[in-house]
From Swiss-Prot:
Name this protein carries in UniProt: PAN2-PAN3 deadenylation complex catalytic subunit PAN2
Subunit structure as annotated in this protein's UniProt entry: Forms a heterotrimer with an asymmetric homodimer of the regulatory subunit PAN3 to form the poly(A)-nuclease (PAN) deadenylation complex.
Organism per entry: Candida glabrata (strain ATCC 2001 / BCRC 20586 / JCM 3761 / NBRC 0622 / NRRL Y-65 / CBS 138)
WD repeat spans: 27-66, 154-194, 197-236, 295-334
Primary role: Catalytic subunit of the poly(A)-nuclease (PAN) deadenylation complex, one of two cytoplasmic mRNA deadenylases involved in mRNA turnover. PAN specifically shortens poly(A) tails of RNA and the activity is stimulated by poly(A)-binding protein PAB1. PAN deadenylation is followed by rapid degradation of the shortened mRNA tails by the CCR4-NOT complex. Deadenylated mRNAs are then degraded by two alternative mechanisms, namely exosome-mediated 3'-5' exonucleolytic degradation, or deadenylation-dependent mRNA decaping and subsequent 5'-3' exonucleolytic degradation by XRN1.
Length: 1093
């Protein structure tokens, strides 16, 4: 290996694209990270810190460049492939062909194990369709990727930080960050041998056939240093050979070895190099035969041999690239290079003679001449440096706008002049912070959250993290893998925002802490009533939230009932953010709202309270608890025509709308109230002039309606509809939102004052305290959304505390933050004041209260199909009434109403804007007692009259028509009937047995206490891999289940028998042994049940 010569005329920088003017202020390091020779074409591939992959031909002219990894992720590793090149970043794997077209792109959104990746290799030298990926995250292990399918084939547990991984035909060598090496068998996925190679770390490694070589570093007194030798291992005998020294007795002295590579053609020759620039070619059969060289210029960052062994590429520390080659060697990098494709130049033929005075001939048809020379615009920055072009002058119209003092003249000249609103948009000179897309993708895929997410105090007027619009919790394992405890350290549960209308969560959190409303709704659950779905579903939700501590609840059933009520009234909910991608998608959908009135949150507040009052009357005749709780009673007098005088009546308003009509005008100036009290007083008295027909004589004329207050409720709900001027005054006025005020009625006129001494009357005086309010938050990153401030009374400390509810984020906030309305990103829209004594009442629970459970012992039929149903269950009797600790097994099936919707930007980043919407389709419950063990007593199919995108028949066993009352022969019941049965069983203290109960309870929308759950998927869990019910039944019970479509009765019974098996193994002390055997044998079949021949 003598006579290597350095090519001085071809050294050139390969980082020119990283030094563009528009990249100089982003704060990212700009250098190349890796280079390789292509094994199938005359190309050199490089990767950089921006995630770009570039290729250069034999003349080192740019051929292809592509942004392979987004989010500023540097390229960690490159590998030549028959179809192109593979590149690896810390969280993604990319495959592209040689023309720059993406063939495969996998990120940590697709594969959660992609985190802190460092290296990759093929499964074996002969099998290049599968790739191992590994890194420094010990929790992710080794990921085996199938490139043909583009999926994760398997994830192998490996609890060490990996720095390098190389493979040969039989084995793979794993270089650990600790300095040791593991030999890995791809056939059995086991480590068969380990070596301690270097005391600190491994810096380079290569493997070929049965030879493995490594370089590394050792620990010194104060730092590490490169070892001056190369370790050699014989993989046939599984032992270490004598090491080979590097640069022994040279004029350069003894330097450490940083790079090593076996010669691709000569198996006994190894190339060893140092970062200082020295490199040797050594014959391992006779280490004394060596040739020493020194690379001129800066130090070496990366050094590689081409696949034919004729070229040696050197990437220096300043990103200059040069090559070494032997005399009379081939110019090709590989023995049989593929032909590179270039754009073809069409021959347009000779141009016709055109007169220079012919103005009718378009110049664009002449075209550009074809050239082979290099243009000045593409010269290297090393040769030709330019400070850039001079910026254009500012348009005269813009300078006039800047210097003009009168906007009226601009409007008269046809120029629209809009002053910038600092209160609405914030400071215009504020620089937008850099947002790491890599961090965002990692947080979404792993369920992690930033450390500062609970910060509520604003810094420099900016939006604090706790107020920001939270992303959808959609990870690989849905919401189960998300760390909700990190965003909620309070005893009050949050709400999942993975629903159709997430901003309705704010209303739920506002009213659930009003004792009178919450206690009444929950008390209605004692009775059986299925005709008021909105009221009962809201009651079930309040009960579930009250029993769930520091967790999360879903509002699925409540949202479905609310949508049904809105649909009946031809209404829909307004999307508050114009930039919301989901709104844009829905506007293009065939199922658009079609002219429905869209309700704002103020209108929804009034509509919801009114609907609850109406359903309360239907639920319990002559019951007006809610009406007396929050409805204001008004007397309405209508002054008719001159003939018939006036008429009178009563009006109950659940919410008082206050807005800019409370302002007064004097001397042409508009005056607004200096606190919310003036708006409240104006809202409680009103006089309206309507132009309509008189009901007595039918004459159309102006009729005056005088509305006067008669009685104030304990709870005062206020809907704020302010214009910009009124809101601006509220933000700049101190104590605009008072902590408390006093109100009274004198001569049918309201008196609202800040102090009790300001009211002089003999009538009753009410003291109101601020309970909470809903605020609209302007988030520049993710659009507007709503949060709730609630003041909650603690019975132990006898004190009130303020809490912020932002969907699933719940945190305690300081009182000063609540009353500070001066922030430009906050706008209150619904405010609740409550009677001082009312807010201190205790919350009641349903414990030790007699509940109507008759639905458990009778059939409930829908659509008169009693005679034609197929009954597969046997009803409970009073003799076998459930008691605390009664064993029951449950399984539920679901169908898909709507599939997922994504927002894919121009870079290919995919964001979930609407998760998959599922609906409960069937619930089966079987007995677990010894008398009638395994006999079902509930088998309810749920009526679904909405469009169903996918019945999931293979997994649910539901066929088209099974859920339709017109065609089904199943036992169909409404959703609230089936839900009440499960809720009653939970209230009676039954113990639920099932497989994957967390998913079942999530779709049923019920929160069962942990002490009442026996989940066989958790009992037979080792690590993170859950075993399927079918596999466990096959191995442990020796039965085949789910051979065709799933059947919920069969699945529930199998889970029950499996739980009995678990108790038997636990009592015998065989559980750990059987569990280890389950996973060891399951790896050979990928935990699948063998197919029948």
């Amino acid at each position: 290996m003598n006579n290597w010569q350095h090519s001085f005329n071809n050294a050139r920088p390969l980082d020119e694209h990283l030094h563009k003017p528009y990249l100089q202020y982003d704060g990212i390091e700009k250098h190349l990270t890796k280079f390789i020779f292509d094994d199938h074409a005359n190309l050199v591939w490089t990767g950089d810190t921006y995630g770009c992959v570039s290729s250069y031909d034999v003349n080192f002219q740019p051929y292809v460049r592509q942004r392979a990894h987004i989010g500023g992720s540097p390229v960690k590793d490159l590998m030549s492939h028959s179809s192109g090149v593979l590149s690896l970043s810390s969280d993604s794997l990319h495959l592209q062909d040689r023309r720059g077209t993406t063939l495969l792109n996998l990120t940590n959104i697709d594969i959660a194990a992609f985190n802190d990746l460092q290296t990759m290799c093929y499964m074996s030298a002969d099998q290049t369709s599968k790739v191992y990926c590994a890194g420094t995250d010990i929790g992710t292990g080794l990921s085996l990727i199938d490139l043909q399918r583009g999926t994760l084939e398997t994830n192998i547990p490996y609890f060490s930080k990996v720095n390098f991984i190389k493979s040969s035909k039989k084995l793979a060598a794993i270089g650990k960050l600790s300095g040791s090496i593991d030999l890995f068998d791809p056939g059995s996925n086991q480590v068969i041998k380990s070596f301690i190679s270097h005391s600190s770390c491994i810096t380079s490694m290569d493997i070929q056939d049965y030879t493995l070589v490594t370089t590394g570093q050792s620990n010194g007194f104060y730092n590490t240093f490169a070892d001056p030798f190369v370790n050699v291992y014989d993989l046939r005998t599984m032992r270490q050979l004598p090491p080979i020294s590097f640069s022994k007795s040279t004029s350069m002295g003894t330097v450490g070895a940083d790079f090593v590579q076996l010669h691709p053609v000569l198996p006994t020759i190894v190339m060893i190099a140092s970062s200082s620039g020295a490199f040797d070619f050594v014959d391992m059969a006779n280490p004394s035969l060596r040739t020493q060289f020194a690379n001129p210029g800066n130090g070496i960052k990366c050094i590689r041999l081409s696949s034919n062994g004729d070229h040696l590429g050197v990437l220096e520390s300043n990103d200059m690239f040069s090559t070494w080659k032997r005399p009379n060697s081939s110019v090709n990098f590989t023995n049989m290079p593929e032909l590179l494709t270039y754009p073809s130049y069409p021959n347009d033929g000779p141009l016709a003679n055109i007169s220079i005075d012919d103005y009718n001939y378009p110049l664009s048809t002449v075209g550009m001449p074809y050239y082979q020379e290099k243009l000045l615009s593409t010269w290297s920055t090393v040769i030709f440096r330019s400070p850039g072009t001079v910026p254009r002058d500012i348009d005269k119209i813009l300078t006039d706008l800047k210097n003009s003092k009168k906007s009226k003249k601009l409007v008269a000249d046809g120029v629209n002049f809009y002053p910038y609103s600092v209160a609405k948009y914030g400071h215009k000179d504020a620089l937008q912070p850099y947002i790491s897309l890599r961090d965002k993708r990692y947080q979404r895929s792993t369920g992690s959250v930033p450390d500062d997410v609970l910060i509520t105090k604003s810094v420099d007027g900016e939006l604090p993290p706790a107020f920001k619009n939270l992303p959808l919790v959609v990870t690989k394992y849905a919401t189960d893998s998300f760390d909700f405890e990190s965003v909620n350290k309070t005893p009050y549960c949050g709400l999942d925002n993975d629903v159709d209308n997430p901003f309705t969560n704010a209303l739920i959190q506002l009213y659930r802490f009003i004792p009178e409303i919450s206690n009444f709704l929950i008390s209605t659950l004692k009775h059986e009533h299925f005709e008021s779905p909105l009221l009962t579903d809201m009651a079930y939700l309040f009960d579930m939230m009250r029993n769930t501590i520091d967790g999360i609840c879903r509002t699925t059933n409540y949202q479905m009932s609310l949508n049904d009520v809105l649909e009946k009234n031809n209404l829909s909910l307004h999307t508050i953010s114009e930039s919301n991608m989901l709104q844009k998608i829905n506007s293009l959908s065939l199922n658009d709202d079609g002219g429905k009135k869209q309700l704002s949150i103020q209108e929804l507040n009034d509509f919801l309270l009114s609907e609850l009052c109406e359903e309360e009357v239907k639920f319990i005749d002559q019951n007006f608890v809610l009406q007396h709780c929050y409805c204001c009673e008004f007397a309405v007098k209508t002054k008719g025509c001159m003939t018939y005088g006036q008429t009178s009546g009563s009006l109950y308003k659940p919410s008082i709308t206050i807005g800019p009509n409370a302002c007064t005008q004097k001397n042409g100036k508009v005056s607004y109230p200096h606190s919310i009290l003036g708006y409240i007083e104006h809202g409680l008295k009103n006089s309206i002039v309507l132009n309509k027909k008189c009901e007595q004589c039918g004459i159309k004329e102006n009729l005056e309606e005088d509305i006067s207050i008669q009685e104030l409720p304990p709870i005062l709900s206020l809907s704020l509809e302010f214009d910009d001027n009124a809101m601006k005054l509220a933000k700049t006025t101190k104590n605009w939102l008072p902590k408390e005020f006093y109100a009274s009625i004198m001569k049918n006129k309201p008196l609202v004052r800040g102090s009790v001494n300001d009211i002089r009357t003999n009538t009753m005086i009410y003291k109101y305290e601020l309970h909470g309010y809903i605020a609209r938050i302007s988030d520049p990153d993710r659009g507007d959304h709503y949060v709730t401030f609630s003041r909650i009374y603690n019975e132990e400390s006898k004190m009130f505390r303020w809490y912020l509810f932002n969907d699933y984020l719940v945190t305690e906030v300081d009182e000063s933050i609540v009353y500070d309305l001066g922030k430009h990103w906050l706008k209150p829209e619904v405010v609740i004041y409550g009677d001082a004594e009312e807010l201190r009442k205790p919350f009641n629970y349903l414990k030790d209260v007699e509940i109507d459970d008759s639905i458990l012992y009778k059939d409930y039929f829908s659509a008169a199909i009693r005679e034609s149903i197929q009954k597969e269950y046997e009803l409970l009797t009073r003799n076998e009434a459930p008691r605390p600790g009664s064993l029951i097994a449950i399984d539920a099936e679901f169908v898909t109403l709507k599939n997922e919707k994504y927002d894919i930007d121009c870079r290919g980043a995919k964001t979930v804007v609407q998760s998959k919407v599922s609906a409960l389709a069937r619930i089966s419950v079987v007995r677990g007692n010894e008398e009638q063990f395994g006999v079902p007593f509930i088998d309810d199919y749920i009526i679904i009259e909405k469009n169903i995108d996918d019945y999931l028949t293979k997994f649910s066993g539901i066929l088209p028509g099974d859920l339709d009352p017109k065609t089904s022969n199943k036992h169909l019941v409404p959703r609230n009937v089936a839900y009440r049965k499960i809720w009653l069983l939970m209230q009676l203290g039954c113990t639920f047995i099932g497989h994957g109960l967390q998913n079942d309870f999530k779709h049923i929308n019920i929160s069962v206490p942990k002490e009442q759950i026996r989940d066989t998927a958790v009992y037979f869990l080792q690590g993170k891999r859950y075993l399927s019910l079918r596999y466990l039944a096959y191995v442990l019970l020796d039965i085949n289940v789910q051979e065709g479509n799933h059947d919920s009765i069969e699945d529930a019974y199998t889970a029950l028998v499996l739980y009995k098996k678990y108790l038997e193994l636990k009592s015998n002390g065989m559980m750990d042994q059987v569990l280890n055997k389950l996973y060891e044998e399951g790896r050979t079949t990928n935990y699948k049940v063998p197919l029948k021949l």
